[in-house]
Amino acid sequence: METLLEKIKKVNEILKDDELFKEIHIAKGENEKFIAEMNNGYKTNEEKLEYLEKITGKSINKSVTVSLPFQTDFGKHISFGKNIFVNKEAIFVDLGGITIEDDVLIGPKVSLLTVNHILEPSKRRGLATGEIIIKKNAWIGAGSTVLAGVTIGENSVVAANSTVTKNVPDNVIVAGTPAKIIKKL
């Protein structure tokens, strides 16, 4: 049987009256309970990882550290590698899929947004998605936003408060809104 992510990847748009749109909102509602419980009160990293496994439906390596509060709307479309650090107040809107490879650092208040609304006024309540991939040893600085369809290259750095709208190659530093290459590593 096809997963929700597989269905989403087959279409360019998900309109508000589509059956898929309804399915998405049901799944999102199921995730909200786990997010609320995880963010309520002190949790050891082991307890946080147990919640993340419920949220993602996947095994999470014990080397992953996530600071609370942490928000995700769907959860099942997040894949964590090893030795990842996610600082507090991160927001992962993961409907389009988020892959975080090994040794990645994600600063506080980072937003990974795999969903956008359709620009055409008659379809504006609909959704367009694109996967975000953060390659090995990348670092996303505090307050940055990465938009749908973007890949952050291996060893690359996104400077604080940047907005990444296009793919970032390996071994560079990007900064600004929209983010542009400011240095090669």
Regions found by a protein language model. Name each.
Residues M1-S63, A179-I182:
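Terminal amphipathic alpha-helical/low-complexity segments used for targeting or macromolecular assembly
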Residues L49, L68-P69:
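Short linear capping/connector segments at secondary-structure termini
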Residues T65, L105, W139, V157, ...:
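Short-chain dehydrogenase/reductase
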Residues F70-F80, F85-I152, T177-L185:
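Flexible, glycine/small-residue-enriched loop-and-beta-strand segment within the central core
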Residues T165-K166:
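Active-site/ligand-binding-proximal alpha/beta "capping" segment
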